[in-house]
Amino acid sequence: MYPKMKNDLILRAAKGEEVERPPVWIMRQAGRYLPEYHKLRAKQSFFEMCQTPETACELTLQPVTRFKGLLDAAIIFSDILVIPQALGMQVVMLEQKGPHFPKPLVVPEDIDLLEKTPNISAKLGYVMDAISLTREKLDGQVPLMGFSGAPWTIMAYMIEGGGSKTFAKAKSWLFRYPEASHKLLKIITDATVSYLIQQVYAGAQLLQIFDSWAGELSPEDFTEYAYPYLVRICQEVKQHLKKKKRDEVPMIVFAKGAWYAIDQLCDSGYDVIGLDWTVSPKEAVRIRGNRRVTFQGNLDPNILYGTREIIEARTKEMIQDFGGGKQGYIINLGHGITPGVNPDDVRFFLEKCHQYGSA
């Protein structure tokens, strides 16, 4: 049994309960903007850090320790690309460039080279070990979040071989090989469902699905190639936990750039919808109507490079525009924090979230 929770604010907010203030955490809060991250990074490669439970645990705890009492969640230090690795693909992290697949998928026949039903607990056991260890070490300070990438985003990486400006290779699959695209998306979805369930068994108390490249799709293509798989993940994870008589775990979907899908996502079964900074909070609240869905976001991460006056003003305005945050709102950035941000400015932002969220 894990230690009793001292702060369950984000769990209550995610379920739509009224709270004393909106909880706050930051996407990529364990990462490159922290000097203590670089001390560990100097000793190990990126994926070695992910694969060493003690290191992943230490990295997860770094922001919680540094900003003691200011963050309302920890998110396990890992990467969305562990799923392609579990499916048998090689992924390396290149300095300054990001992820690189030496042998990306080129034609539909390449799907046959994948390990279609991998043993997730064997392949990604190190993530579960990191989650269990972190849950113990957190000692109930804040809930621990697990995560995965969304099928379309994972597929895009597997075909592009890394990030891309145009996603021409991945999108051409959708328009040249629609059947093979669905076949690949199904393989990724099945592995992801299994992976998320294992994370809950290991101790994850919330789950976030990152659809980082959702905004590359038109509304029609999102509806065909992204949305159904996001819904399946949510349904299958929740159904499995219910069947096993496990506590329900709130699920968050973050489809970056898919502002056109807010209405759709409000009906997707996810408890929380992450919004990026291109979305007007007031408009999102209007679209949601009286549906019991919590929003998460959505400050432009680059505002943290701004003056203290602007950080404060924009934070206050955001909380007010989401309705004050006492119900249906989790404060976050509209995307991951960037490496050049000064941790002191992060502390200032978090303090202002507490100040205006409690008002």
Swiss-Prot record:
It comes from Schizosaccharomyces pombe (strain 972 / ATCC 24843). HAMAP family: URO_D. This is Uroporphyrinogen decarboxylase. GO terms for cellular component: cytosol; nucleus. Keywords: Cytoplasm, Decarboxylase, Heme biosynthesis, Lyase, Nucleus, Porphyrin biosynthesis. The keyword Lyase applies. GO terms for biological process: heme biosynthetic process; porphyrin-containing compound biosynthetic process; protoporphyrinogen IX biosynthetic process. It comes from the Eukaryota. Monomer. Belongs to the uroporphyrinogen decarboxylase family. Catalyzes the sequential decarboxylation of four acetate groups of uroporphyrinogen-III (octacarboxyporphyrin) to yield coproporphyrinogen-III (tetracarboxyporphyrin) with the formation of intermediate hepta-, hexa- and penta-carboxylate porphyrinogens in the heme biosynthesis pathway. Acts on a number of porphyrinogens, but only coproporphyrinogen III can ultimately be converted to heme. PANTHER family: METHYLTETRAHYDROFOLATE:HOMOCYSTEINE METHYLTRANSFERASE RELATED (PTHR21091), UROPORPHYRINOGEN DECARBOXYLASE (PTHR21091:SF169). Its main location: nucleus. It is an enzyme of class 4 (lyase). Pathway: Porphyrin-containing compound metabolism; protoporphyrin-IX biosynthesis; coproporphyrinogen-III from 5-aminolevulinate: step 4/4. Disulfide bonds: none annotated. Its EC number is 4.1.1.37. InterPro entries: UROD/MetE-like_sf, Uroporphyrinogen_deCO2ase_HemE, Uroporphyrinogen_deCOase. The gene is hem12. It is found in: Nucleus; Cytoplasm. It catalyses: uroporphyrinogen III + 4 H(+) = coproporphyrinogen III + 4 CO2; uroporphyrinogen I + 4 H(+) = coproporphyrinogen I + 4 CO2. Transmembrane segments: none annotated. Signal peptide: none annotated. GO terms for molecular function: uroporphyrinogen decarboxylase activity. The record marks 79 as: Transition state stabilizer.
